[in-house]
Amino acid sequence: MARLFDHYKNIVIKELIQQFNYKTVMQVPKITKITLNMGVGEAAVDKKIMENAVSDLEKISAQKPIITKAKKSIATFKIRQGYPVGCMVTLRGIKMYEFLDRLVSIAIPRIRDFRGIGGKGFDGHGNFNMGIKEQIIFPEIDYDKIDKLRGLNITMTTTAKTDIEAKALLSAFKFPFKN
């Protein structure tokens, strides 16, 4: 059982029921999925770049990512319809909680000049987006074996109705928000 899942069941639910006066446990928001997306625009020129990005994302998420393809051709970017332009992986269940645990306790503290996550990543419906500029903050990535520093987008989809509920949920998971 994942450490953060036990933390959610035993502590977070009680805190949120007390804070927002929910009537049942089913009203308490929870994280449904975490989506990791890595855009690799240079993959149209060199196929090896996409293979490296896929292997990095696979090491980070412990799950095989799918390759996303361009929906339409854009001449200025030298991209044709169907060209690979990125990779993504969706985490649910125990793997999601294990990734969240590694993100909060190991990866985020390794970010250089980190002063907390800004609260502007909420979308108005209780979901949270954040970007990471370098994949080397994850301990699974060996610094000597990467070809290029790549960033990735992390989207946390929750059942929260408002951003306030979602921020309280993520703060209960010890997410380091700026005050």
UniProtKB/Swiss-Prot annotation:
Entry-linked Gene3D superfamilies: 3.30.1440.10
Top-level lineage group: Bacteria
Keyword tRNA-binding: yes
Pfam families: Ribosomal_L5 (PF00281), Ribosomal_L5_C (PF00673)
Biological processes annotated in GO: translation
GO molecular function: rRNA binding; structural constituent of ribosome; tRNA binding
GO terms for cellular component: ribonucleoprotein complex; ribosome
Keyword tags: Ribonucleoprotein, Ribosomal protein, RNA-binding, rRNA-binding, tRNA-binding
The protein's assembly and partners: Part of the 50S ribosomal subunit; part of the 5S rRNA/L5/L18/L25 subcomplex. Contacts the 5S rRNA and the P site tRNA. Forms a bridge to the 30S subunit in the 70S ribosome.
Annotated PANTHER family: 60S RIBOSOMAL PROTEIN L11-RELATED (PTHR11994)
General function of this protein: This is one of the proteins that bind and probably mediate the attachment of the 5S RNA into the large ribosomal subunit, where it forms part of the central protuberance. In the 70S ribosome it contacts protein S13 of the 30S subunit (bridge B1b), connecting the 2 subunits; this bridge is implicated in subunit movement. Contacts the P site tRNA; the 5S rRNA and some of its associated proteins might help stabilize positioning of ribosome-bound tRNAs.
Family indicated by similarity: Belongs to the universal ribosomal protein uL5 family.
Name the record gives this protein: Large ribosomal subunit protein uL5
Organism: Nitrosomonas eutropha (strain DSM 101675 / C91 / Nm57)
Lineage, broadest ranks: Bacteria, Pseudomonadati, Pseudomonadota, Betaproteobacteria, Nitrosomonadales
Annotated gene: rplE
